[in-house]
Amino acid sequence: IEITSTGFNPATLEVKLGDTVTFVNKDNQAHWPASAMHPTHTVYPGSDIEKCGTADDNNIFDSCKGIRQSEEYKFTFNEKGSWGYHDHLAAGLRGKIIVN
């Protein structure tokens, strides 16, 4: 999924259980992809912004920091469902991952 100043492309992505999704920042500003809802990031099971900086931060749908231009954030989806996400640094930018 590419991240630009106008949002995520594609904004909605359908994947299979166990697939890894890569977010790539194509903007010159930092972006912070994370599970909905802003500001807690708790919609995806087990995710919570409060887990950033802990031993659990590699297991949550949260980059836990702004990623710079050309940097990537990867997350493997191990829960079926429709998972909203957003940019923590620009909360109006939103998308959805559908895991089948």
Report residues per predicted region.
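Extracytoplasmic copper-binding redox domains, predominantly the cupredoxin/blue-copper superfamily
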Residues: 1-100
